[in-house]
A protein has these predicted regions:
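Short, hydrophobic/glycine-enriched beta-strand segments
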Residues: 1-8
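Acidic/glycine-enriched connector segments
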Residues: 8-103
């Protein structure tokens, strides 16, 4: 299972992020690909969550992530805040996507 996430322009809390990610993984092992970096305030919480839940955490830039179609299987895209690049790519490839906004 892959969850692709972005935190561009996200103002929510670490608890909200971890709840959403946990819901999508639902106890499964997998890979969480972070596009565009992790906000410093979220980083320790996200890394701890990934270690405890056997989730492989990968960070990449938008330029590194042009080959989104190379991923296969169960893929969910979660956009925390707004990332138009990732939204456009999700629509192009008909991927399941969720936009999470919390001010």
């Amino acid at each position: 299972m892959y969850v692709i996430a972005s935190f561009e322009n996200f103002k929510g809390t670490s608890y909200h992020v971890l709840d959403v990610l946990s819901f999508h993984f639902n106890g499964s092992k997998g890979t969480c690909v972070i596009v565009g970096g992790i906000p410093p305030i979220l980083e320790p919480f996200l890394k701890d969550w990934a270690n405890k839940n056997d989730i492989h955490l990968v960070q990449c830039t938008k330029d590194d992530f042009k080959d989104l179609d190379m991923l296969f299987g169960d893929i969910s895209v979660i956009i925390f805040g707004m990332n138009t690049f990732l939204l456009k790519k999700s629509l192009e490839l008909s991927l399941r996507y969720y936009i999470i906004k919390e001010e």
